Amino acid sequence: MNKMIKYVMSLLMVMTLCLPTMQAQVVNDEEVVEDNEDSAVADSAMVETIAADTLRLPWTETVKVGLDKLLKSKMFETSQVGIMVWDLEADSCIYRFRERQLMRPASTMKLVTAITALDKLGGSYQFKTTLKYTGTIDNGVLNGDVYCIGGMDPRFNNDDMTAFVTSLKDMGVDSIHGSIYADRSMKDEDLLGEGWCWDDNNPVLSPLVFGRKDIFMERFLAKLKDAGIFYAGSGTSVKRCPASAFTICTRFHTMDQILHKMMKDSDNLYAESMYYQIASSTGNRPASAKSARNVQRQLVRKIGLDPARYKFADGSGLSLYNYVSAELEVKLLRYAYQDENILPHLKQSLPIAGVDGTLKRRMRSGFAHGNVKAKTGTVTGVIGLAGYCKAANGHDLCFSILNNGIMHSNNARSFADKVCELLCQP
């Protein structure tokens, strides 16, 4: 019993001696924390700085992460999108997502048409409409026939028509004793493109267009009357001009003039006119959409893709039958970039973000503003954007974004704009 008491007393003495030390240690720990609060915050900031400086993702990885995040939008639960981004300086793919998925391109189809035309026809190509005659001119009387030869120039305007009539007057013609013909042999008789909707505002597919309407001959007769040139006939007919006919006047418009309107304003008439110039270049008369498609397929094969994988129907993108991919558009943009005979003409025709054309009201601020040069595409259920931009590292990029099955076009446009901002930001 005495031993037990002594043992307990000894234990209590030890605990009493140790308690101040234990309490001091706890206080010291609390003081350390309190005294070093500022240091702790500084250390935390230092870690973040180090992470930003040394652990920062390369630019290409930042783009990938950012695009992956954008693709998590609920919009893509009910719609489809294909994206491809290509670094033209490094000549390598930066990003791809369902880039081979077939999509309706809407007006980004005009990119395919423009690049094909520049490749086939060249930047110096001219759209022309010619006035010719047969017979003789005696004492102010043209004893013969007059031919208006259509070249499907969508830009032919009042000044051009005036030049036609003035040229006749300059030759001393006061009256025409013969017939006046419209030579429409340049293209086939199809008035609508394959797969066009009947209720769309479709362009007039005529080799002789005036004021966007099929009223060329009507206006020509009116101009003759205004100029005091008497015409003995009662109307006009359609007939191919003989090779022996003499030229009175030819009016030209340049490739760049047509491209500018076609791309900046997404003009369907201009695009279809371009399409039939491509067809006409094959030598097949009358020119047809089929001939133009064959030229497109040749170019697709030239850039290393299989044309059998795509469907081409028209030059404007109005057709519901067009099916392309983001990969195809990017490969064509890459091809154009590498050809000094194509790129200057193409690039100056593209809408500039926040500046002009169909991109004037988009990307009006931020890094994409004034940087992105791209063709828009919009039809019911489809939004597209494809073109060029410059990354913060100075590299030129080309990209294609094709979005199908959409209910709210503004959401799809916003998505495409965010993609462009991501590509352009540092």
What name fits each language-model region?
Residues 27-89, 93-101, 166-171:
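Beta-lactamase-like hydrolase cores
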Residues 311-314, 318-426:
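C-terminal soluble interaction/assembly domains
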Residues 82-86, 95-96, 113, 145-149, ...:
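Soluble periplasmic/extracytoplasmic beta-strand elements of cell-envelope proteins
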Residues 213-349:
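A small/polar active-site loop signature that marks catalytic segments
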Residues 126-188, 196-203, 210:
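Active-site-adjacent, His/Asp/Glu-enriched structural segments that form or flank metal-binding
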Residues 1-30, 44, 54:
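Bacterial Sec-dependent N-terminal signal peptides
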Residues 91, 105-123, 180, 219-224, ...:
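Active-site SXXK
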Residues 49-58, 96-105, 146-156, 165, ...:
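Second-shell loop/turn segments in exported
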